């Protein structure tokens, strides 16, 4: 089982091909890293036959033999390759894999998987104001943090930013992360998957766990700690 240490904030940069999504991702990563935040990214590649591995390589032979995951370690890099069909992988699984140890996970693409998820903020990259207004009226993406594109737009309920204004978008994201840090977080995992919890359940679970922990010898509880509960060995655990 991979470590389910999900990022505090997940942001999906979505939009049509050729609109500049990667440029926006680059700008956000640089700006957030400059603020001291840990940032991870994930990129959706639509090509069916795409693979980082190569037939005949030792790592490829490991996978062909049936290894669930193959980790390749070199002096300057560690890569892990897992084989599965994207339709078999829920978005939560992708997030769990991609965001280990990070404050923010930025995903490029994944429109169909993340487009309507309320726990994933969307930055929609467009070709112009007209496209932004059309997308806003269609309700294809929710919630939208901002549109990014050329020109200026009026009448939108969310900010419309130019490519040179990505820094201000990073400021908003950083503030959200800092607020989440300040209040602490509570998460419940069954196997590799995170179970959605409402605010009331989070608070009750947190109080129970911290109250129990405070009774243990040598444990000093402040009350603002993050709480993560892992239940292992669930049916369907993918490793």
Spans of features found by a protein language model:
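Short, hydrophobic beta-strand segments that form beta-sheet elements in well-ordered domains
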Residues: 105-109, 120-127, 142-150
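Conserved lysine of the Walker
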Residues: 21
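Extreme N-terminal, non-catalytic leader segments
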Residues: 1-14, 18
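C-terminal accessory "lid"/substrate-recognition subdomains
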Residues: 100-104, 145-239
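Phosphate-binding/switch loop-helix module in NTP-utilizing enzymes
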Residues: 81-113
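N-terminal phosphate/diphosphate-binding loop that engages ATP/GTP or pyrophosphate donors
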Residues: 4, 29-86
């Amino acid at each position: 089982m991979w470590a389910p240490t999900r990022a505090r904030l997940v942001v999906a940069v979505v939009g049509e091909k050729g609109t500049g999504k990667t440029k926006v991702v680059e700008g956000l990563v640089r700006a957030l890293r400059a603020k001291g935040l840990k940032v991870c990214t994930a990129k959706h590649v639509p090509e069916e036959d795409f693979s980082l591995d190569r037939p005949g390589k030792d790592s490829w032979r490991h996978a062909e033999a049936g290894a669930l995951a193959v980790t390749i370690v070199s002096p300057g890099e560690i890569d892990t390759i897992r084989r599965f069909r994207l339709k078999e992988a829920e978005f939560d699984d992708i997030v769990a894999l991609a965001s280990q140890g990070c404050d923010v996970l930025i995903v490029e693409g994944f429109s169909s998987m993340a487009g309507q998820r309320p726990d994933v903020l969307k930055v929609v990259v467009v070709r112009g104001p007209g496209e932004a207004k059309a997308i806003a009226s269609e309700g294809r993406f929710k919630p939208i943090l901002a549109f990014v594109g050329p020109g200026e737009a009026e009448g939108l309920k969310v900010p419309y930013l130019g490519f040179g204004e990505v820094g201000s978008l990073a400021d908003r994201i950083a503030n959200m992360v800092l607020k989440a840090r300040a209040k602490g977080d509570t998460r419940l995992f069954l196997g590799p998957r995170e179970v959605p919890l409402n605010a009331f359940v989070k608070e009750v679970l947190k109080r129970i766990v911290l109250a129990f922990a405070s009774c243990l010898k040598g444990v000093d509880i402040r009350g603002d700690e993050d709480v993560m509960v892992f239940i292992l060995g669930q049916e369907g655990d993918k490793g």
